[in-house]
């Protein structure tokens, strides 16, 4: 032990350090972890580090909010999945449409990025291309949230204490190349009375840019009371808080890394992991869809893992247009060129399984 210490060598552990925590507004901001008006960014990162050590939840807020962590060692890129991210996703006990076969419940997918470099401020970031990357993900979504000027106000929506609580403005490019923009408000619910604005952030606005995943919630009661948040498919992969912690789809392969043009990048190891809330969605009384994380695991430190690693089949980048018949009986999901799912496709061009499909 003396020799190892003298040489500057230390054992690798599963302990992570939170180096950045910048949630977007959300119902559990300032509570997971706790923060006050006097809390600094450094202090909230320390609190988040302690929470993750105990596998307690960290709330990232609505779209764009993120956390960045670092192990006490680089994570190696070896065969199969390289690390696991814990969340709080679960399946619905009673799905009125799909019953026990449901792939829905509470799944709030976060996009995962990996960083290479010695400094979080200057490292090179790469997105891990999940199952929706080449089909329905929007890659240039930008949103600005405005700090609320009051914590209560006019409210007519159910379970609201302030309908026009936090103003937001968003821009993006649709799949057909059309430039889009939208403006609206997040309401404040009666269930969480603290401010939803992160108290350690300076300034009057927060802006987030990056990939955005398609909405995944369906209100199944017809009365606004029962929201089900679905996985994109049984074999959907590549997103945090989007599957059960124990299954293979909560693991991530560094080989999924792509550059800004969606091209594969070979990485020997990574130094940082960033998780970003990937959906911009509001579900009535349930509130915003917000990714939560509860831990990170370097799989290569798990005894015996490398002898039988998890290998997840991936969707390839579309290379052309295939042709199928409109009366096909195959159980395949189709999306239009804006990323919206089409249940009964007619003649035209769609995206399916990562490829452009022409239905005649």
Placement of each model-derived feature along the sequence:
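Bacterial Sec-dependent N-terminal signal peptides
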Residues: 1-13
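A domain-level signal for the mature, folded cores of soluble proteins
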Residues: 12-108, 130-317
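Beta-strand signatures of extracellular beta-sandwich domains
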Residues: 111-113, 333
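Short loop/turn segments immediately following beta-strands, especially the blade-tip
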Residues: 115-120
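Tryptophan-centered short beta-strand motifs
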Residues: 121-128
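Residue-level detector of functionally pivotal "anchor" positions at catalytic/ligand-binding pockets or at interdomain
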Residues: 312-338
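C-terminal tail/sorting-segment detector
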Residues: 349-360
């Amino acid at each position: 032990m003396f020799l190892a210490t003298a040489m500057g060598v230390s054992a690798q552990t599963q302990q992570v350090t939170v180096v950045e925590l910048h949630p977007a507004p959300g119902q559990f901001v300032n509570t997971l972890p706790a923060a006050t008006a006097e809390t600094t960014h450094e202090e909230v990162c320390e609190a988040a580090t302690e929470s993750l050590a105990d596998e307690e939840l960290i709330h990232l807020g609505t779209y764009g909010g993120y956390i960045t962590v670092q192990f006490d060692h680089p994570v190696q890129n070896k065969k199969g999945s390289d690390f696991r991210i814990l969340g709080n996703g679960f399946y619905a006990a009673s799905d009125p449409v799909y019953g026990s076969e449901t792939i829905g419940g509470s799944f709030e997918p976060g996009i995962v990025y990996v960083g290479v470099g010695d400094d979080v401020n200057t490292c090179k970031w790469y997105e891990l291309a999940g199952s929706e990357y080449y089909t329905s993900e929007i890659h240039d979504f930008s949103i600005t949230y405005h700090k609320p000027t009051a914590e209560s106000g006019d409210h007519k929506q159910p379970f609201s204490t302030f309908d026009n609580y936090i103003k937001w403005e968003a821009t993006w490019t649709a799949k057909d190349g059309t430039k889009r923009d939208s403006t609206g408000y997040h309401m404040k619910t009666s269930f969480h009375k603290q401010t939803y604005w992160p108290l350690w952030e300076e300034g009057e606005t927060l802006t987030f840019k990056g990939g955005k995943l398609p909405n995944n919630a369906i209100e199944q009661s017809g009365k606004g009371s029962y929201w089900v948040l679905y996985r994109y498919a049984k074999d959907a992969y590549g997103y945090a808080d989007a599957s059960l912690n124990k299954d293979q789809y909560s693991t991530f392969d560094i080989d999924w890394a792509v550059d800004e043009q969606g091209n594969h990048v070979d990485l020997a190891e990574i130094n940082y992991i960033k998780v970003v809330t990937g959906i911009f969605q509001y579900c009535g009384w349930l509130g915003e869809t917000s990714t939560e994380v509860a831990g990170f695991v370097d799989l290569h430190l798990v005894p015996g893992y490398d002898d039988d690693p998890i290998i997840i089949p991936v969707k390839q980048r579309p290379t052309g247009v295939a042709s199928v018949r409109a009366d096909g009986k195959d159980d395949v999901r189709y999306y239009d060129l804006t990323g919206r799912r089409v249940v009964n496709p007619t003649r035209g061009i769609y995206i399916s399984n990562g490829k452009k499909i022409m239905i005649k």
